[in-house]
């Protein structure tokens, strides 16, 4: 049965390799992407075995953490992430792509990559996004894959600020990722923050609050929860959690 598995699928199942590294490995090993394990020649099998042994012996400390920060609308994810970017240079904050228009003060390539729907479709088709989702039934957001894989291989910790849908996709594709849920002190404070920022009309505010209820109900899916009383304290707690040694993978109860 194992011999029928394509080498591409086999490599993608190895932790921390990913699509980009798999493609590079196949080129170096001289193995076609469509080749199956059972169809490898003797020299190809040997090269693949050596490649896997070398990866296994590589110092574990080089591979840092991928951490996802998610939470309901207006909880302050962007503000906390910006604080981490400015005050914790050892952490790489991933820049997402989005189809929405820039808000006042946002800079393309720093806060987001602002793209149109056609460009976003091309990124999906090319497999360039680690995750993507439509948020608030309006705009699409996605995380470019290549910068994250390169940063992790270079030994940097990476923080992704994404929504609940994206967090679930990352958990499915990268189980070793650490998921942190950012909470408001109270529901009333969340409503105050949303209505006070003045970037949405009343109908949009109501839609976002309904989405927030769904997101808050899913907080137990996350590894850690942080309450955003103040930006500095929440940011410090998120960074501290990024540096904690990961717990063993929990066995499935299925």
Curated annotation (Swiss-Prot):
CDD domains, A to Z:
GMPK
Does Transcription count among this protein's keywords? no
**Keyword field:** ATP-binding, Cytoplasm, Kinase, Nucleotide-binding, Transferase
Give the location in the cell: Cytoplasm
EC number(s) per entry: 2.7.4.8
Q: Which SMART domains match?
A: GuKc
Q: Name one GO cellular component term.
A: cytosol
Task: Give the main localization category.
Answer: cytoplasm
- Residue limits of the Guanylate kinase-like domain? 64-243
Q: What class of enzyme is it?
A: transferase
Q: State the reactions this protein catalyses.
A: GMP + ATP = GDP + ADP
Give binding positions for ATP.
71-78
Q: Which GO terms describe its molecular function?
A: ATP binding; guanylate kinase activity
Q: Which domain of life is it from?
A: Bacteria
* Keyword ATP-binding in record: yes
| InterPro entries linked to this entry | GK/Ca_channel_bsu, Guanylate_kin-like_dom, Guanylate_kinase, Guanylate_kinase_CS, IHF-like_H2TH, P-loop_NTPase
Q: Give the UniProt family note.
A: Belongs to the guanylate kinase family.
* Job description of the protein: Essential for recycling GMP and indirectly, cGMP.
This protein's name: Guanylate kinase
């Amino acid at each position: 049965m194992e011999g029928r598995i394509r080498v591409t699928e086999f490599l993608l199942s190895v932790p921390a390799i990913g699509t980009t590294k798999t493609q590079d490995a196949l080129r170096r090993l001289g193995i076609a992407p469509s080749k199956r394990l059972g169809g490898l020649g003797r020299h190809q099998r040997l090269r693949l075995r050596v490649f896997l042994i070398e990866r296994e012996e590589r110092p574990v400390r080089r591979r840092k953490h991928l951490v996802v920060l998610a939470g309901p609308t207006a909880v302050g994810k962007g503000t906390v992430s910006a604080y981490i970017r400015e005050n914790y240079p050892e952490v790489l904050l991933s820049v997402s792509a989005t189809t929405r228009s820039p808000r006042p003060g946002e800079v393309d390539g720093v806060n987001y990559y602002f793209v149109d729907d056609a460009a976003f479709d091309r990124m999906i088709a090319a497999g360039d996004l680690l995750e993507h989702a439509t948020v608030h039934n309006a705009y699409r957001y996605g995380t470019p894959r290549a910068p994250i894989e390169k940063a992790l291989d270079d030994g940097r910790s990476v923080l992704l600020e994404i929504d609940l849908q994206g967090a679930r996709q990352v958990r499915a594709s990268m189980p070793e990722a650490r998921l942190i849920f950012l909470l408001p002190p109270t529901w009333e404070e969340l409503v105050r923050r949303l209505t006070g920022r003045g970037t949405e009309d009343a109908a949009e505010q109501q839609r976002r609050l309904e989405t927030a209820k769904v997101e808050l109900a899913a907080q137990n899916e996350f590894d850690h929860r942080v309450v955003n009383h103040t930006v500095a304290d929440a940011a410090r707690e998120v960074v501290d959690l990024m540096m904690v040694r990961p717990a063993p993978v929990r066995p499935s109860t299925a």
